[in-house]
């Protein structure tokens, strides 16, 4: 009989566990401390619980931490990890070390429903949403855990399409009884879903990144079908109701496609669209994927685009591309091969 994972449980849920097992009320905080602060590898290591209570706990629960089943290493130091989340399903997470920081790109779903034209995860289709345990396991089981400084929810899947479990995972990451991270170390990236965006802004203090890619609705809907359900104009109008002028950061991701969205008219329309918002724009180089007739703009074009926006008051950066040689860069994550091979 499968055991229930402790990783991914809130303090309230741990209190229910200890109550059901006849353990003292304070034992829930002890378990949370061992799990999220001391990062034990077995229930036996929870030595301030009595032997009897540890045995009771082991009878129905395990830590719920599973090591990656595979990894790929890039020449630039990026590492892509493959996690098995169930018998037949897998997700990828990407560890990106830098001089002064180390970031983990975390997945929220197996596949994705959004079907963005430029993304391999979308081409894979949607299989399942991850639980808070499966989201946090990508972090807790990371071999480089002790070096990690930042988490970005920019891996496989649309986080706002799995908002209950994503918010639960983010709560545990930032709660004092949990990992105790500052929300300023975490960024959630989304295409922008009407039903989830407002809730995320109001229930989380983590940074927000919106996938933009075109300021023109008709073109954006071709690149990103989600535009048809919740337009970028409506999204911007909603975002203007909130204060992003302090520590919380709002950014817009913009993949620059050659001859598609890289001309001056696009830069001018971006300025018009985002006027009045305290935000930044991150320009991203497109990484070619099979079967997609798009090409990335050159660095000279991207630099000119950035300089125009910045000179007109919109802070803009060019995001460094990492892990392209192992299909770990933006838009390149997919576990379609593993999913298919496990069916056979």
Curated annotation (Swiss-Prot):
Give this protein's Gene Ontology molecular function annotations: 4 iron, 4 sulfur cluster binding; metal ion binding; rRNA (adenine(2503)-C2-)-methyltransferase activity; rRNA binding; tRNA (adenine(37)-C2)-methyltransferase activity; tRNA binding
Which positions bind S-adenosyl-L-methionine? 157-158, 189, 211-213, 287
Q: Which EC number(s) does UniProt give?
A: 2.1.1.192
Protein's UniProt keywords contain Cell division: no
Q: Which SUPFAM superfamilies match?
A: Radical SAM enzymes
The record's top EC class is transferase
Looking at the record, the residues that make up the Radical SAM core domain are: 98-325
* Disulfide links within the chain: 105-330
Q: Name one GO cellular component term.
A: cytoplasm
Please name the Pfam families in this protein's record.
Radical_SAM, RlmN_N
The protein's UniProt keywords, in alphabetical order, are: 4Fe-4S, Cytoplasm, Disulfide bond, Iron, Iron-sulfur, Metal-binding, Methyltransferase, rRNA processing, S-adenosyl-L-methionine, Transferase, tRNA processing
Q: Which residues bind [4Fe-4S] cluster?
A: 112, 116, 119
The residues responsible for catalysis, as annotated, are 92, 330
Source domain of life: Bacteria
Q: What's noted on cofactor binding?
A: Binds 1 [4Fe-4S] cluster. The cluster is coordinated with 3 cysteines and an exchangeable S-adenosyl-L-methionine.
Q: Name one GO biological process term.
A: rRNA base methylation
Cofactor(s) recorded in Swiss-Prot or TrEMBL: [4Fe-4S] cluster
Show the catalytic activity: adenosine(2503) in 23S rRNA + 2 reduced [2Fe-2S]-[ferredoxin] + 2 S-adenosyl-L-methionine = 2-methyladenosine(2503) in 23S rRNA + 5'-deoxyadenosine + L-methionine + 2 oxidized [2Fe-2S]-[ferredoxin] + S-adenosyl-L-homocysteine; adenosine(37) in tRNA + 2 reduced [2Fe-2S]-[ferredoxin] + 2 S-adenosyl-L-methionine = 2-methyladenosine(37) in tRNA + 5'-deoxyadenosine + L-methionine + 2 oxidized [2Fe-2S]-[ferredoxin] + S-adenosyl-L-homocysteine
Briefly, what is this protein's role? Specifically methylates position 2 of adenine 2503 in 23S rRNA and position 2 of adenine 37 in tRNAs.
Task: Tell me what else is known.
Answer: Reaction proceeds by a ping-pong mechanism involving intermediate methylation of a conserved cysteine residue.
Q: Which family does it belong to?
A: Belongs to the radical SAM superfamily. RlmN family.
Protein name, as recorded: Probable dual-specificity RNA methyltransferase RlmN
